[in-house]
C-alpha cells in the first residue's frame, strides 16, 4: 500500500516520525507531502524529507492518509489542494489517521459530520462544531477514521491504523 502523510513546518515531531517508520516497518510505501519538496522541520527540530508538493499529489494513487498534529495543520488546512486531497481520500473510505491538531484539516474538508473521534482537547469544540462526537479516549476508530489525542497515544493510534492497512 501507498500511504500519504500531509504536513508542514511546525509538526509535532513524534506524531510524524513514529507513523513514518511504523508504517514502513509493516512493508508499506510512505510519502510525505507539503507545500513544496525539500525538508520540513518539527517543533523540536527534527527534519523530514518531503517527497511531493501538495500540487503533485493524486489522491487516487494513495491507499491511506496520515494527518499528524502540532502547528502544521493550522497552515496545511489553508491549502486548497491539501484539503481536497483529504476530502477525497476520506470520502472514498480510505483509512485516515489523525492525531492532536490533525483533525483541523478534516474540519476544513467538511467530512466530520456524524462521525466519532478525538483530538487534542484544545480543538475539542471545533471538532464538535464540525458535527462530530468528540470522545476523550486514547484512540477512537470510526469506520475508516482512526484518531488520537496526543503523543502519549501514539502506540494505540498506530496499532489501530495498521490494522486498517492489513
Curated annotation (Swiss-Prot):
Output the Gene Ontology terms for molecular function. peptidase activity; protein deglycase activity
State the EC number(s).
3.5.1.124, 3.4.22.-
- Location(s) in or outside the cell: Cytoplasm
Q: What class of enzyme is it?
A: hydrolase
Q: Which domain of life is it from?
A: Archaea
Active site feature: 101
Q: Which CDD domains match?
A: GATase1_PfpI_like
Entries under Pfam families matching the protein: DJ-1_PfpI
Where is each PfpI endopeptidase domain found? 1-166
Biological process (GO) annotations held by this record are: proteolysis
Keywords attached to this entry: Cytoplasm, Hydrolase, Protease
A single GO cellular-component term from the record reads: cytoplasm
Reaction(s) catalyzed by this protein? N(omega)-(1-hydroxy-2-oxopropyl)-L-arginyl-[protein] + H2O = lactate + L-arginyl-[protein] + H(+); N(6)-(1-hydroxy-2-oxopropyl)-L-lysyl-[protein] + H2O = lactate + L-lysyl-[protein] + H(+); S-(1-hydroxy-2-oxopropyl)-L-cysteinyl-[protein] + H2O = lactate + L-cysteinyl-[protein] + H(+); N(omega)-(1-hydroxy-2-oxoethyl)-L-arginyl-[protein] + H2O = L-arginyl-[protein] + glycolate + H(+)
S-S bonds: none
Q: Which InterPro entries match?
A: C56_PfpI-like (IPR006286), Class_I_gatase-like (IPR029062), DJ-1/PfpI (IPR002818), Peptidase_C56_Deglycase (IPR053435)
Q: How does it assemble?
A: Homohexamer formed by a dimer of trimers that assemble into a hollow ring structure.
Q: Which family does it belong to?
A: Belongs to the peptidase C56 family.
Physiological role: Deglycase that catalyzes the deglycation of the Maillard adducts formed between amino groups of proteins and reactive carbonyl groups of glyoxals. Thus, functions as a protein deglycase that repairs methylglyoxal- and glyoxal-glycated proteins, and releases repaired proteins and lactate or glycolate, respectively. Deglycates cysteine, arginine and lysine residues in proteins, and thus reactivates these proteins by reversing glycation by glyoxals.
> What PANTHER family is this protein classified in?
DJ-1 PROTEIN (PTHR42733), DJ-1_THIJ_PFPI FAMILY PROTEIN (PTHR42733:SF2)
Q: Know the name of this protein?
A: Deglycase TK1284
